[in-house]
Amino acid sequence: MTGRVKKTNPRLTSLITTLKDASRTGEVKIWRDIANRLEASTSAHAEVNISKINRYAAEGETILVPGKVLGSGMLNQSVRVAALNFSESAVSKIAKAQGTCMTIEELLANNPKGSRVRILR
């Protein structure tokens, strides 16, 4: 008998519920997409290195990672990065480049329409 595996991380389940609610009330599809990506198994969550953010992001852009940001590589520009988790080295490298680290919850509060956000996977 196959059943649906329930997430045991209370922060993650709360975030998924909040994103779905924001998607419904604001009719913003980006939050539904992120909620669906976070509902997938943990092994399917994104793991993005700083080097990939540096390659695909423009100066001052907002990047959303539905998973963890890792510290491999260099960051040469100031970007705002929202993610589920950050490694310690990623936080220090983003701060060194005068960028900003934030949670997905903070991004949702600051930008409820989800405009001008780039999703990296």
UniProtKB/Swiss-Prot annotation:
Record's GO cellular component terms: cytosolic large ribosomal subunit
MF terms (GO), sorted A to Z: RNA binding; structural constituent of ribosome
Annotated organism of origin: Methanosphaerula palustris (strain ATCC BAA-1556 / DSM 19958 / E1-9c)
Gene3D superfamilies hit by this protein: 3.100.10.10
Keyword Ribosomal protein attributed: yes
Ribonucleoprotein among keywords: yes
HAMAP family the record matches: Ribosomal_eL18 (MF_00329)
A Gene Ontology BP annotation from the UniProt entry: translation
Name of the molecule in the record: Large ribosomal subunit protein eL18
InterPro entries per UniProt: Ribosomal_eL18 (IPR000039), Ribosomal_eL18_arc (IPR022947), Ribosomal_uL15/eL18 (IPR021131), Ribosomal_uL15/eL18_sf (IPR036227)
Record-stated family: Belongs to the eukaryotic ribosomal protein eL18 family.
Annotated keywords: Ribonucleoprotein, Ribosomal protein
